[in-house]
Every structure is written in C-alpha cells, then in structure tokens.
Design a protein with these regions (language model features):
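NTP-dependent small-molecule kinase module
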Residues: 122-130, 136-198
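Short, hinge-like loop/turn segments at secondary-structure boundaries
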Residues: 32-35, 84, 175-176
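Glycine-rich phosphate-binding loop used to anchor ATP phosphates in small-molecule kinases
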Residues: 36-102
Length: 198
C-alpha cells in the first residue's frame, strides 16, 4: 500500500487501495482464522466489487490508475483460508457478483523471503497484524508464487525485494520506479542491487 501511494504520487494519477482497515472482521481473523475467515473474505469480495463498479462509473477515460491489489488476490486468499464448504459458498457468491475488473497495464509482484516479510509487517506497526504467524506468511508467499508462475493476463514485473526498501529508501524507490516505467510486455524479472551496497 505504501509503495502504491508513492507510485501514484510520482505519476500524478488515481490511487485505488485495498481498504483493509474498513473490514470489521479482519482483526478477529488474525486472532481466530478458522472462525473468521469466511466473513473476512466475503467482506473483501463485496468491497472489491463495489470499488470496481465505482471505478467503472467514475472516469472511464482515466489514463492511469495505481492499485495495491488484484481482484484475483481475493480468490487466492479465500483458497488459502477457507474450508472446502466455505470456499464453495465463496465461489457461488463470486459468480453471482459477475465482477468485470479491468485488466491492468502492468502488475508488479514484490518477492521477499518470509523472514523479511515478518520484519516488514512488524515495522508497519498495525496492531492486528502483529498476530500474523510466520507459517501463515509462508503459505501465503507460496500461494503467491504459484499464482504468479501461471499468471498471464497482463504484463508482469517480478521484483526481488529482499535487499531493497523502495518505501523508505529514496534511491531504491527511484530504481524501482524507473524499472516500472520501462517495463515491456510479457514477464520480466528485476533483481536490483540495493543502493547502499553499490
């Protein structure tokens, strides 16, 4: 989210954010994932459907939008957290919503080892995220890797973010922004050298 904000500001364009803080079930999910997963996922699904509808109705000709989520992310989280019966119900709701999300011009996937992810989650300081378990982040990271291994709906830039901090380091951010702006079609990999090590 922080990186999406910076990119949108640099490009002077619309920003579409996941509004996790509005989800009344999310804090409970991190305490009790088994019992809170379904309402958490359904809330996010309805929120995304609303956001996409608003986006389509607002400025149809907005040249650039930056978002911190893909609609497909919802399904990935649902598969990871819901029981088989709950996932079936989620799928039925998803189909009924008939969400027609616009295809992105570019997807940026930041990859980092779980230890780095845990450190960054802790640094963000969001109270309910402090309950995130490393095991959950490992499963989530694996699910993202599998998802993006098959992803071919839009150009994809896979960034090794282990050694860079584009949110808090201006040189790292500029390096990444330059790479985003020069990204071509298809799948590309970016393995930057952190600025302070150069």
């Amino acid at each position: 989210t922080s990186l999406a904000r910076k990119v949108a500001a640099s490009l002077d364009c619309d920003l579409v954010l996941e509004r996790a803080e509005e989800n009344p079930f999310l804090e409970r999910f991190y305490r009790d994932p088994v019992n809170a997963a379904l309402p958490t996922q359904l809330y996010f699904l309805f929120q995304r459907a609303r956001q996409i509808q608003e986006m389509r109705q607002s400025d149809l000709f907005a040249p650039v939008r930056v978002s911190d989520f893909l609609l497909e992310k919802d399904r990935l989280f649902a598969q990871l957290t819901l029981s088989d019966d709950e996932f079936w119900l989620y799928e039925q709701v998803y189909k009924q919503l008939s969400i027609d999300a616009p295809l992105p011009d570019l997807v940026v996937y930041l990859q980092a080892p779980v230890e780095i992810l845990v450190e960054r989650v802790q640094r963000r300081g969001i109270a309910y995220e402090k309950n995130i378990q490393a095991d959950y982040l490992t499963r989530l990271s694996d699910a993202y890797m599998q998802f993006f291994y098959r992803y071919d709906h839009a150009p994809l830039l896979i960034v090794n973010a282990e050694s860079i901090d584009p949110v808090n380091n201006a040189q790292d951010y500029q390096l990444l922004l330059d790479r985003i702006m020069s990204a071509g079609p298809g799948r590309e990999f970016f393995n930057p050298v952190p600025f302070q090590a150069r």
